């Protein structure tokens, strides 16, 4: 979990985790833990990035961090199966998408990053956010279908 005490500051951020939650999600290897920390670190990097969507884009930021987790896994040839399987059964809420959507974005990031490299697109944070958003728009009807369980729009 990423805690930001002051939205405008990078100097007061805290990165922490819940061991029981990690155990419940089957995060039982250094590689899986590293991917979870990639997701949490992504929240820090994106803390001042505005995403479109209900609840100030809370789901979209979660999915973007999941995508970045997948990107890292693709670049370093890391296994995402434990993290993805641990997330698949997690319920959604107003702040977090259901696990099936999250696993989808992790897997997409892992395999899509190779295409991005082959196209010669520099792997900058902004370019990867753009690539994430292209995919988000492709499957927006599926995302909104899930969001309707938690939001009225």
Describe each region flagged by the PLM:
Residues 19-35, 52-57:
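Short pre-active-site segment immediately N-terminal to the catalytic Zn-binding motif
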């Amino acid at each position: 979990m990423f805690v930001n005490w002051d939205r405008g500051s990078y100097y007061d951020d805290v990165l922490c985790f819940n061991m029981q939650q990690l155990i419940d999600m089957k995060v039982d290897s250094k590689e899986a833990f590293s991917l979870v920390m990639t997701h949490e670190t992504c929240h820090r990097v994106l803390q001042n990035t505005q995403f479109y969507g209900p609840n100030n884009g809370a789901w979209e930021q979660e999915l973007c961090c999941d995508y970045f987790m997948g990107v890292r896994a693709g670049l370093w040839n890391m296994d995402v199966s434990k993290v993805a399987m641990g997330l698949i059964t997690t319920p959604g809420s107003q702040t977090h998408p259901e696990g099936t959507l999250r696993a989808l974005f992790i897997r997409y990031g892992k395999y899509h990053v190779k295409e991005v490299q082959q196209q010669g697109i520099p792997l900058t944070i902004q370019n990867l956010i753009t690539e994430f958003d292209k995919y988000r728009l492709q499957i927006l009807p599926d995302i909104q279908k899930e969001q309707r369980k938690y939001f009225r729009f």
